[in-house]
Amino acid sequence: MKSRFLFALVCAAAFFSGRSLAAPSGPELGLQTWTCRNMTFDQVVDFATKHGLKQIEFIAAHLDPAAPRAESLRKKAILDAHGLTAYSFGVNRPGLDKEENRKLFEFAKLMGMKVIAVEPQDLRAWDNLEELVKEYDIKLAIHNHNLDSVYGNPATVEKVLAHRDHRIGVCLDIGWITAAGFDAAKVFHDYGDRVYDMHLKDKEIVTNDGKSVAVDTEIGKGNANYAGLFAEIKKSGWTGVMAIETDSKAFAENPSRLVDEARVFFNAQTANVKTVATR
């Protein structure tokens, strides 16, 4: 009888140990340091830590690919000590010189990054960039700006993706895709599984001297179709980083309020997106 009881306890322990809670699925909130462009690297670290943002995409002013190796490693050690991850950097504009572009990949490898946000101005650069993607096994994410920019129209991006390595994908700037006149939810859907990064940004179109101008707003208060986008995120099971970013000089002067409100909005939108596995 005793042996049977012990056997039952062992079985129960094994059963419940297998039902450990997995990390929540769904997107993760991050920070694009263009938002903190008036800060130093150390100030960015303090800001991100204070606001609980662990996934950081850096601009060169804070983490420079051209810096000496020792300097990059020093900064990486600081990030590690604060529990922060430099998951990407950009937006970079690589050109036709493959060996010059190699420096970006070497830097990403050194920092442990899995994706680089890029916006090459010459479409011919994709030949050498694809070779580097295959060599380093590091993803490239095409960033979009306004409609007049090289990748402002998703149709241009789709042409690049069509015959390129699957590790070449998209960094979807939600604010700019909206300002360019596209529905962020539809664009996300149409890109399929090629979205590797997103910039959490919002813009509204206003008229200034008879011209339409895109103006940054708090996240969720502009023209971006966030309800539709998060519905698509839930449907697809996308689990990348949505990095808070603003182009507004006013917001960048003191981004704390923007970031705090973005977190509230993000949490509300993802409340029904994230799920917890039980096996």
Functional labels for PLM-detected ranges:
Residues K2, G18-V115, S149, D193, ...:
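N-terminal pre-domain/capping segments
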Residues L21-L29, R37-G52, N153-L172, T178-R279:
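Histidine-acidic metal/acid-base catalytic patches
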Residues Q43, H62, I78-G169, A179, ...:
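Active-site acidic/histidine proton-transfer and metal-coordination neighborhood
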